[in-house]
């Protein structure tokens, strides 16, 4: 039993020694990566997400709140993502808002939990200036580089409309650099009006992929799905590139093992190169001794003591390696020594260099998660049966059935040979029962000499019992051997019994030589023949050695560079335990002086059996050089060791040969085995359509709906004339709308063609005519002829344009405003000396472009307007109006003061000036304010903006709202000029005709809503009119005399009606009958009587039409189809056809 315990401990000792020596891991194969599956670093994927919010002026209040709500919803969805493998997500979130500046709140370094993150995002305030996406991307990249975790997944989610400030740098290069650093971008558009090309440029998405929009109700789910795929792909890639962690702390030192099995005796070493020492100095001549009688020849004596080693000679050339000798027989076991004291544990050694990283096999698939809890039952729905649902989850596999009972059937016939099956999958290695000990195999070939370092001296084992004394040897004396190297002093042998031989001649005394260098330990010589037993000598005193001093603690070595993980090598075969070698006998503690070499004595009598010596542990000797590798010993007897750990599954073997043999008899039914693994996923068929569910309870009433005022309905049919009422008493009411156009009169019959007259004689050339009349002179002439009222009085005017140049306007719309201001100034201010104009350009700051005293000509005014710079920041309307109030302090006394505000957004909340206070100051200074608001009715901020427009304007009739900047038409200019110069402009409208505008929204009938027109086209002549054309707009054209003519709409009458007006200052006169043409007058072509109809298509071309009210031809834009016949290709054709002479 004791031998089994010793063998078991000896087998465990190499396993412990290969892993740790005094707390230090030895070199060897590194642990498999699969063994570290539960390691923290390998089980977590780090994810850093930065939300980038557009806080510019174009995002306004509602869009900025929508962005914060989106971040709140998506951040919660991100934490609901679960990895598909045995991993965990470690997620950190940060938020960044940008405009012309960037604010990071919160950063990644201050991440605590999701609740704190949501609170800080909700507290963000709108910056409200220009859009600079470049700085947002650069700051997000710097944030992820500095505070993002190494080897983590980095994602930036950018929300913007992609319409940057003109001074914003290009984002292409910085976006590409960020993606090279491993940052993934996801872009979201704020509205349907986005720059899709720029958003794709930032995210790197292909052109065929649609752009994500913030208004999409499924946006959160779409981005959650996209992030889930991104995280799974990135984290799986990171796991494959995992690195070895830091080495752990050294473990506690192991217990000392039992002494190993006695090893075999090694082969005899080659004799060393003995060199003869130098001859010593001649000593003094001794006294001649007494010459004795010659004795008998004695027996061969024992070999003499080993002589002193001579001085070390030079190293000779390295000789060839000798042939491996045959191992000698095992020696007798030595006496068992006493158990020594346990030594102190040595200091931990330095860490060894890390090995190359290994590549582990794929881990086992994780278990399926638990099923979620059942939600609360919802209300019973009402509706038709829906489409068949998707296939349900796969069911759990059923248990294996009980084995059937029955008698074994007869042996079946041998079936036909089937085809060779495919190579099977790699099987799982299952440790089987330990097999029986096999027969002892033949001795294997000699292994390659091992390379190892000298180990420390082991603890001396217990002294074994003395072996039996061998029989005396017999043999003839051999030749005298060469003088060998001096060996260690052996024990003093017993005194021999024999005839004293003759005394030898004394040798010359040599000079003492230099002490030689301690020689190498010689190999053990062959066991000599037993000498004659001598007399027992005196028993010496037992020596006791002192323990040597404790060695100095070595310095801790520096940590080696991390090496690459190597491929694990194949597991080698288990070695056989060696045979325990004999323990040497301790020598005497005091060596005696060497006596003279005596003659060989005769054979002595066998001595008595000696007592066992006391084992005394001597001091630790110096470490000797490495000896030659011994031959492998014979396989020793022993008990089979403990089964080793389960090895890795080997590669699948080659496909076996097709078996040939008869079918065996059917075996008896085996014992019922455990239930098998789950089978493959089944393929089900779609079930039948379910029955219609029961009618559910009625739902709660919905919230009240919101809607805008509908468009004005069509005019109803004319009612029957009522009886004439009594004359009422009251004040005169407002002027009514234009009535409907009457029915077109019956076309007269064409008269017969008269006889052609005789051609007259060509007359003489008349004198040169007078200079033609100007536009103003023609208007004055018409007024004098028609007698329709006084001409417009040019009233002195102080006009200040307050122009919004904020970020939401945009550079293109700002150019439209510039053109609009120049055109409006031409209509209003015929003389800059009478009507003076000032300009204020504002955004987050206010620029006084021109004062009221600056301009002397319209060319200077237009040049200043063209040189205005687009600011593109916030909307500080209150500060701009305050600057207008300061400018009006330079106004002339008693002159009308008008401010025209053109804006597209509500005032910035950070404006230091209060809008209500500034407007009150303007009203107190008798400043009349008009407002042109450009905003769509479906805009979320329309109600707020509309209230602000009414607050700014002097009264509700001074507010004009348009959907966009393209709808600033001349009709608006007329309404403004009616307020400024009422008589003159109203006269122009009544003389040339004006379409009736239907207000679609608002507080007053003065508000105008016009849709976007067709692109404008320019006319080539000395006077150009550039404008669009559609059903709701007018076309101003030039007559041959240069008069600006307005085409008569289809609703206008064909006759010149008397001009009636209820306005003050306008006198009513009767038209001059001499200038009126008779309605019964016939034209050469019936097309001349048709009203002008531009048509309904979009292919506009220039044509000429005849206006019978002024008996003149003019140009107009013809749409290309469905127009009236009153159109001609040239002015000449129109004149020849229609104009009456």
UniProtKB/Swiss-Prot annotation:
Disulfide cysteine pairs (residue numbers): 1088-1138, 1097-1121, 1113-1134
Tagged with keyword Membrane: no
Domain BPTI/Kunitz inhibitor, first and last residues per copy: 1088-1138
Location of the region described as Disordered in the Swiss-Prot/TrEMBL record: 242-770
Any GO BP: cell adhesion
Location of this chain's protein in the cell: Secreted, Extracellular space, Extracellular matrix, Basement membrane
Tissue: Expressed in skin, intestine, sternum, brain and kidney. Lower expression is also observed in heart, lung, sciatic nerve, dorsal root ganglia, peripheral nerves and calvaria of newborn mice and in intestine and brain of adult mice. Found in basement membrane surrounding a particular subset of Schwann cells in adult sciatic nerve.
Every Collagen-like domain range: 243-300, 301-358, 501-544, 545-588, 733-769
Keyword tags: Basement membrane, Cell adhesion, Collagen, Disulfide bond, Extracellular matrix, Protease inhibitor, Repeat, Secreted, Serine protease inhibitor, Signal
Signal peptide extent: 1-20
Compositionally biased region (Pro residues): 345-356
Biased composition (Basic and acidic residues): 291-311, 735-753
GO molecular-function terms, A-Z: serine-type endopeptidase inhibitor activity
GO terms under cellular component: basement membrane; collagen trimer; collagen-containing extracellular matrix; extracellular region
Ranges annotated as biased composition (Low complexity): 335-344
Residue span(s) of domain VWFA: 48-227, 798-976
Subunit structure: Trimer or homomer. Secreted into as a 135 kDa monomer under reducing conditions and as a homotrimer under non-reducing conditions.
Similarity field: Belongs to the VWA-containing collagen family.
Function description: May act as a cell-binding protein.
Full protein name: Collagen alpha-1(XXVIII) chain
Encoding gene (name): Col28a1
């Amino acid at each position: 039993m004791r031998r089994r315990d010793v063998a078991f401990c000896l087998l465990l000792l190499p396993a412990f020694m290969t892993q740790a020596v005094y707390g230090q891991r030895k070199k060897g194969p590194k642990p498999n990566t699969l063994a570290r599956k539960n390691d923290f670093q390998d089980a977590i994927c780090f994810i850093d997400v930065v939300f980038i919010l557009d806080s510019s002026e174009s995002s306004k209040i509602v869009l900025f709140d929508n962005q914060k709500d989106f971040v709140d919803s998506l951040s919660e969805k991100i934490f609901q993502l679960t990895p598909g493998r045995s991993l965990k997500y470690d997620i950190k979130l940060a938020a960044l808002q940008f405009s012309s500046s960037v604010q990071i709140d919160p950063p990644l370094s201050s991440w605590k939990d999701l609740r704190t993150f949501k609170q800080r995002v909700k507290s963000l305030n709108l910056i409200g200036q220009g859009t600079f996406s470049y700085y947002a991307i650069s700051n997000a990249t710097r944030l992820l580089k500095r505070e993002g975790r190494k080897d983590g997944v980095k994602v930036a989610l950018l929300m913007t409309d992609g319409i940057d400030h003109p001074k914003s740098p290009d984002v292409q290069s910085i976006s590409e650099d960020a993606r090279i650093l491993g940052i993934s971008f996801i872009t979201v558009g704020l509205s349907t009006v986005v720059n899709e090309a720029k958003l794709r440029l930032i995210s790197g998405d292909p052109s065929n992929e649609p752009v994500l929009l913030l208004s999409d109700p499924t946006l959160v789910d779409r981005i959650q799905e996209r992030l889930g795929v991104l995280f799974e792909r990135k984290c799986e890639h990171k796991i494959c590139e995992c690195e070895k962690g830091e080495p752990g702390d050294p473990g506690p030192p192991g217990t000392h093992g039992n002494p190993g099995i006695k090893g075999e005796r090694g082969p005899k070493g080659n004799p060393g190169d003995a060199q003869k020492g130098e001859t010593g100095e001649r000593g003094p001549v001794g006294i001649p001794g007494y010459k004795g009688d010659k004795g008998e020849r004695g027996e061969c004596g024992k070999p003499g003591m080993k002589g002193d080693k001579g001085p070390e000679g030079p190293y000779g050339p390295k000789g060839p390696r000798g042939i491996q000798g045959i191992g000698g027989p095992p020696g007798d076991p030595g006496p068992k020594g006493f158990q020594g004291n346990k030594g102190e544990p040595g200091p931990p050694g330095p860490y060894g260099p890390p090995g190359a990283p290994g590549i582990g096999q794929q881990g086992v698939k994780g278990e399926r998660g638990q099923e979620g809890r059942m939600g609360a039952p919802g209300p019973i729905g009402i509706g038709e049966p829906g489409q068949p649902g998707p296939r349900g989850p796969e069911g759990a596999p059923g248990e294996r059935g009980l084995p059937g009972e029955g008698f074994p059937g007869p042996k079946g016939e041998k079936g036909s040979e089937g085809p060779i099956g495919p190579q099977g999958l790699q099987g799982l290695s299952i440790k089987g029962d330990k097999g029986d000990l096999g027969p002892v195999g033949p001795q294997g070939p000699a292994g390659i000499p091992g390379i190892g370092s000298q180990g420390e001296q082991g603890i001396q084992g217990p002294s074994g019992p003395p072996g039996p004394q061998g029989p005396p040897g017999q043999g003839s004396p051999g030749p005298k051997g060469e003088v060998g190297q001096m060996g260690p002093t052996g024990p003093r042998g017993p005194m021999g019994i024999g005839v004293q031989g003759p005394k030898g001649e004394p040798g010359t005394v040599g000079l003492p030589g230099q002490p030689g260098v301690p020689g190498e330990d010689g190999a053990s010589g062959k066991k000599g023949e037993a000498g004659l037993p001598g007399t027992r000598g005196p028993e010496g005193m037992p020596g006791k050695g002192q323990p040597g001093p404790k060695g100095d603690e070595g310095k801790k070595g520096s940590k080696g560079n991390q090496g690459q993980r190597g491929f694990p090598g194949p597991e080698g075969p288990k070695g056989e335990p060696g045979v325990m070698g004999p323990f040497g006998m301790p020598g005497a503690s005091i060596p005696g002086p060497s006596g003279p070499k005596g003659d060989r004595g005769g054979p002595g009598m066998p001595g008595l059996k000696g007592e066992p010596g006391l084992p005394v542990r001597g001091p630790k000797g110096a470490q000797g050089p490495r000896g030659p590798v011994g031959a492998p010993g014979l396989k020793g007897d022993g008990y089979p060791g403990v089964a080793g750990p389960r090895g890795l599954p080997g590669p699948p073997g080659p496909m076996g040969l097709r078996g040939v043999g008869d079918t065996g008899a059917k075996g008896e039914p085996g014992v019922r085995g455990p239930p098998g693994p789950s089978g493959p996923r089944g393929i089900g068929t779609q079930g039948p359509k379910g029955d219609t569910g029961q009618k559910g309870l009625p739902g709660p009433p919905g919230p009240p709906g919101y809607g805008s005022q509908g468009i004005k309905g069509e005019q109803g049919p004319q009612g029957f004339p009522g009886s004439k009422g009594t004359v009422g008493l009251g004040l005169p009411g407002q002027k009514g709308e234009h009535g409907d156009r009457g029915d077109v009169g019956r076309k007269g019959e064409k008269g017969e063609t008269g006889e052609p007259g005789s051609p007259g004689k060509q007359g003489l050339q008349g004198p040169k005519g007078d200079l033609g009349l100007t536009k103003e002179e023609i208007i004055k002439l018409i007024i004098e002829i028609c007698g329709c009222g006084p001409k417009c009085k040019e009233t002195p005017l102080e006009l200040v344009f307050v122009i919004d140049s904020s970020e939401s306007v945009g550079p293109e719309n700002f150019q439209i405003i510039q053109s609009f201001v120049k055109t409006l100034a031409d209509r209003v201010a015929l003389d800059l000396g009478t009507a003076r104009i000032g300009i204020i350009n504002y955004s987050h700051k206010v620029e006084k472009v021109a004062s009221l005293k600056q301009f002397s000509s319209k060319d200077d005014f237009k040049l200043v307007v063209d040189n205005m710079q687009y600011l593109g920041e916030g909307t500080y309307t209150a500060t701009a109006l305050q600057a207008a109030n300061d400018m009006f302090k330079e106004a002339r006394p008693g002159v009308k003061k008008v401010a025209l505000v053109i804006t597209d957004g509500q005032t910035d909340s950070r404006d230091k000036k209060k809008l209500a206070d500034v407007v009150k100051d303007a009203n107190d200074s008798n400043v009349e304010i008009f407002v042109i608001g450009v905003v769509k009715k479906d805009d979320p901020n329309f109600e707020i903006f509309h209230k602000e427009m009414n607050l700014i304007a002097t009264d509700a009739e001074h507010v004009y709202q348009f959907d966009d900047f393209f709808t600033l038409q001349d009709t608006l200019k007329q309404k403004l000029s009616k307020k400024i110069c009422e008589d003159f402009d109203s006269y122009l409208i009544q003389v040339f005709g004006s379409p009736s505008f239907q207000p679609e929204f608002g507080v007053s009938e003065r508000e105008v809503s016009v849709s976007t027109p067709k692109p404008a086209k320019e006319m080539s002549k000395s006077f150009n009119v550039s404008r669009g054309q559609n059903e709701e707009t007018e076309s101003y054209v030039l007559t041959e005399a240069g008069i600006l003519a307005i085409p008569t709409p289809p609703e206008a009458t064909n006759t010149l009606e008397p001009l009636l007006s209820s306005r003050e200052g306008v006198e009513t006169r009767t038209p001059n009958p001499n200038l009126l043409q008779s309605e019964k007058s016939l034209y050469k072509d019936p097309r001349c009587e048709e009203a002008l109809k531009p048509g309904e298509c979009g292919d506009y071309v220039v044509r000429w039409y005849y206006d019978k009210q002024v008996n003149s031809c003019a140009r107009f834009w013809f749409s290309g189809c469905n127009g009236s016949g009153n159109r001609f290709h040239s002015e000449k054709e129109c004149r020849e056809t229609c104009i009456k002479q």
